[in-house]
A protein has these predicted regions:
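Zn-dependent metallopeptidase/amidohydrolase metal-coordination segment
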Residues: 9-12, 338-341, 345-358, 421-479
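Midchain, well-structured core segments that form catalytic/ion-binding scaffolds
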Residues: 23, 103-106, 146-147, 153-367
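Acidic/His- and Gly-rich active-site-bordering loop/insert found
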Residues: 3-103
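Active-site-adjacent substrate-binding region
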Residues: 219, 226-228, 233-249, 403-446
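Short secondary-structure junctions
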Residues: 40-46, 237-245, 292-296, 343, ...
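His/Asp/Glu-rich mid-to-C-terminal helical/loop segments that flank catalytic regions of hydrolases
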Residues: 158, 223-241, 268-273, 320-327, ...
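Substrate-recognition/cap regions that form aromatic- and gly/pro-loop-enriched pockets
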Residues: 343-432
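Active-site metal-coordination/substrate-binding segment of hydrolases
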Residues: 65-147, 152-163, 189, 203, ...
């Protein structure tokens, strides 16, 4: 494990190093919540946990600066628990093993947690600082952002007092985000009665892995391969041409990550196994050809393993309906923003497919900065799975964050950034969910901007943070807090 705590600036890296030692996957936040409260008590910082599981910290103004506008610094405490297929890491018990790789910090075949651990570490650095001049400050460290923004959604109104929100969940240094996409989770489920497998049939497990995956908002416009969408094309042909039957399917594991791996168990007549192996080889070639220049094709694996024949399998009619629905379900970009053609407006990610033991569950995350188009896409997907006889539920819907290019805090941030770095910052809206939109719905008078150091491949085992960006990011935060204007 690399010693990252002495990297510059030590104020942030020291705290981030501590965070890597505390397990904090989404949905399992008891340890990090307790750690943050204990840390605040030891640092002499006022802190409490609200009913939503968020940690709120408060620091009074430096004497003489009590009349300045109040600033809320915001980041989320949870991290995406993704790992390489051969990793034995347990996200609920094991610390993250960090590695310094040139100008980057990464983990050992797991997500790093810099999304959004570096934001949390920045809040901690400000709160414990003894020499930083500032007005009234609050730190809002939210729970379960990655699985549905539940902490932000359940944030009590009236809990915060600030006038300005600095969100630290943007992943390209020099970009200042003033708008984001809304989102909605779509879950299609079906209970079915399994049927017996033909005793003369063999069984084969087919695995596709080695795809890049990635963030289903930020990287959806790159055209990366979706393991579930690739797999369904193969499965449909195996069923129609080789008399194969579906016994089970497992693809993807995170609603907001492009699935990089999928596996199915098929049963089929023994005399067709060789033809199935040939079909897998053909589809591997096809996938590599289609995604040449997008995927790292030498990492793609598509292979078969002979397995014990399961006693039960999916009924033929149910199987065909499920396969057709997965095949037809929209995945990827639906529309670019008409006013900003370089930015994705509406997209969806066919994130998770689980078909096993008489139960099917398919999970999709749709995003759009346009509320009508978000619901149009969600209803399109609902209709697709309704035709397969599935029950479809919507959850976790949140609206987008409408940009305000005349924001006072944006103007101030851009001014300080140019003073410090000699170049102009880039104002952006992003095709991803940021908690800013939800917090704004509860605190509509906040002036909001989001920024942060550069991260690459968040939500994947290749996640990494650029070391050289963290110091200028910290310098910007410090000067901003010092120069916040009076109310």
């Amino acid at each position: 494990m690399a010693d990252i705590k002495n990297l510059n600036p030590v104020e942030i890296w020291r705290n981030f190093d501590k965070l890597t030692q505390v397990p904090r996957p989404s949905g399992h936040l008891e340890k990090i919540q307790a750690y943050l409260l204990d840390w605040a008590k030891e640092a002499g910082v006022e802190a409490f946990q609200d009913p939503a599981g968020n940690i709120v910290m408060r620091k009074p103004a430096t004497p003489g600066m009590e009349n300045r506008k109040g600033v809320i610094m915001q980041a989320h405490m949870d991290m995406v628990p993704q790992k390489a297929p051969d990793s034995k890491h347990n996200f609920e018990t094991d610390p993250i093993e960090t590695i310094i790789d040139g100008d980057w910090v990464r983990a050992n075949h797991t997500t790093l947690g810099s999304d959004d651990g570096l934001g949390v570490a920045t809040i901690m650095a400000v709160m414990e600082s003894k020499d930083l001049q500032h007005g009234p400050i609050e730190g809002l460290i939210t729970a379960d952002e990655e699985t549905g923004m539940y902490g932000a959604n359940d944030l009590p109104a009236g809990e915060l007092n600030g006038d300005i929100l600095l969100n630290f969940d943007t992943e390209v240094w020099g970009e200042f985000v003033i708008g984001s996409a809304g989102g909605i989770d779509i879950t299609a489920t079906l209970d079915y009665k399994e049927v017996e497998t033909d005793k003369e049939d063999a069984a084969v497990k087919v695995t596709l892995k080695g795809l890049k995956g990635g963030h289903s908002g930020i990287e959806i416009n790159e055209g990366r391969a979706n393991a579930n969408k690739c797999m369904v094309r193969f499965v449909r042909e195996a069923i129609s041409e080789l008399d194969a039957r579906l016994a089970s399917w497992q693809g993807g594991n995170m609603r907001n990550a492009i699935p990089f791996q999928a596996e199915v168990v098929l049963t089929l007549p023994k005399e067709n196994i060789e033809a199935l192996n040939d079909l897998v080889a053909d589809w591997k070639d096809e996938i590599c050809d289609e995604f040449e220049g997008i995927e790292t094709t030498e990492n793609i694996e598509f292979f078969t393993e002979n397995v014990e024949t399961p006693k039960m399998q999916v009924p033929a009619e149910i199987q065909d309906n499920l396969v057709d629905a997965i095949y037809a379900c929209h995945d990827g970009v639906l529309r670019m923003a008409p006013s900003m053609p370089e930015i994705v407006e509406t997209s969806s990610n066919l994130a998770i497919v689980e078909i096993v033991d008489g139960k099917a569950a398919i999970k999709i995350l749709a995003r759009s900065s346009h509320e009508y188009y978000k619901m149009y896409l969600a209803t399109m997907i609902e209709s697709c799975f309704n035709m397969a006889g599935m029950k479809v539920e919507f959850s976790g819907s949140y609206m987008g964050w409408n940009p305000n290019p005349k924001s006072d805090i944006l103007e101030h941030v851009l001014k300080v950034y140019k003073e410090q770095n000699g170049t102009d910052g880039k104002v952006q809206a992003v095709h991803a969910g940021l908690e800013c939109s939800i917090i704004l719905s509860k605190y509509p008078n906040l002036d909001v901007v989001s920024f942060g150091p550069t991260l690459l491949s968040p939500h994947t085992a290749n996640e990494r943070c650029q070391i050289s960006c963290v110091a200028p990011f910290w310098n910007l935060v410090k000067q901003l807090l010092t120069e916040i204007p009076a109310k």
